[in-house]
Amino acid sequence: MWKRWLALALVTIALVHGEEEQRSKSKICANVFCGAGRECAVTEKGEPTCLCIEQCKPHKRPVCGSNGKTYLNHCELHRDACLTGSKIQVDYDGHCKEKKSVSPSASPVVCYQANRDELRRRIIQWLEAEIIPDGWFSKGSNYSEILDKYFKSFDNGDSHLDSSEFLKFVEQNETAVNITAYPNQENNKLLRGLCVDALIELSDENADWKLSFQEFLKCLNPSFNPPEKKCALEDETYADGAETEVDCNRCVCSCGHWVCTAMTCDGKNQKGVQTHTEEEMTRYAQELQKHQGTAEKTKKVNTKEI
């Protein structure tokens, strides 16, 4: 019996002590404002301090935070902001709507230097297989003569091969030039055209995007070692294959040039739609190429000085 009275006495003392603590806390924290997500607490020294709210009331009034997360109510949002030390605001009332965002992981189709060099190697291998040595009573065909034959076959009469003519020449041997860097056949066909442009750029002395026979000969000369080009951006140089992101787009360093996707942030491919985002992307691409041009000029000057 006495144990029951003792337990009751202890409970009464605890309640009285709790009420006194609560009155003391209310008195100490009376003029303290802690802000959203925080509450006033009393330290061991009896001084007020602001701490993250320990537990919010369970009333249900969902809100969507600026971080895209749904909270049960305003209190839970501000409490989370306090606990994580981040700035979270109420975006709108209700559950957050699912956002269809475009991941910048979608990269543009590009011809890397490895793709370009592999295509070039296959073309040379195919042409070398057509070499016919001179016989006792017959004249064969050397490498230059074979190139001359193909050059004349695909030249439209202006003594130059442009990219479309070069591509037709390349497609003469479908097996040899069938580069499959992408699972999509359409992308692989696009890749081939891009690599043809990269090959033309290798020996296009006057930058007219056409090859004379001498330029064509240099491009496919087995002893010619294609140079490795890097991309420049903000006083830094990046190796082939390097990537950078801008908004919802990804830019890739390809054969010395930055190549960017052209996507709006709602996930739609831009095809002639003049939007503010597209203009920004155009300026960004121009800026990348400007840095690239400056870097190449600097490189030439340094080479001359050496």
UniProtKB/Swiss-Prot annotation:
Glycosylation, residue list: N142, N173, N178
GO MF, one term, reads: heparin binding
Q: Follistatin-like domain: from which residue to which, for each copy? A: 28-51
Do you know which InterPro entries this protein is assigned to? EF-hand-dom_pair (IPR011992), EF-hand_FSTL1 (IPR057020), EF_hand_dom (IPR002048), Fol_N (IPR003645), Follistatin/Osteonectin_EGF (IPR015369), Kazal_dom (IPR002350), Kazal_dom_sf (IPR036058), Prot_Inhib_GrowthFact_Antg (IPR050653)
Residues bearing PTM Phosphoserine? S163
PROSITE patterns given in the database record: EF_HAND_2, KAZAL_2
Looking at the record, the residues that make up the EF-hand domain are 142-176, 191-226
In terms of Pfam families, this protein maps to: EF-hand_FSTL1, FOLN, Kazal_2, VWF
Q: Where is this protein chiefly located?
A: secreted
Q: Which UniProt keywords apply?
A: Disulfide bond, Glycoprotein, Heparin-binding, Phosphoprotein, Repeat, Secreted, Signal
Which cysteines bridge via disulfide bonds? C29-C40, C34-C50, C52-C82, C56-C75, C64-C96
Question: May I ask which residue range the UniProt record assigns to the signal sequence?
Answer: 1-18
Q: Which CDD domains match?
A: EFh_SPARC_FSTL1, KAZAL_FS
Q: Where in the cell is it found?
A: Secreted
List GO BP terms, alphabetically. cell differentiation; endothelial cell differentiation; endothelial cell migration; hematopoietic stem cell homeostasis; negative regulation of apoptotic process; regulation of BMP signaling pathway
> Where do the Kazal-like domain residues begin and end?
46-98
Task: Give any Gene Ontology cellular component.
Answer: extracellular region
Q: Where is the VWFC domain?
A: 231-285
Q: Does the keyword Transferase apply?
A: no
Quaternary arrangement and interactors, per the entry?
Homodimer. Interacts with SCN10A. Interacts with DIP2A; DIP2A may act as a cell surface receptor for FSTL1. Interacts with BMP4. Interacts with CD14; this interaction promotes TL4-mediated signaling cascade.
- What PANTHER family does the database record attribute to this sequence? FOLLISTATIN-RELATED (PTHR10913), FOLLISTATIN-RELATED PROTEIN 1 (PTHR10913:SF13)
What is the protein name for this chain? Answer: Follistatin-related protein 1
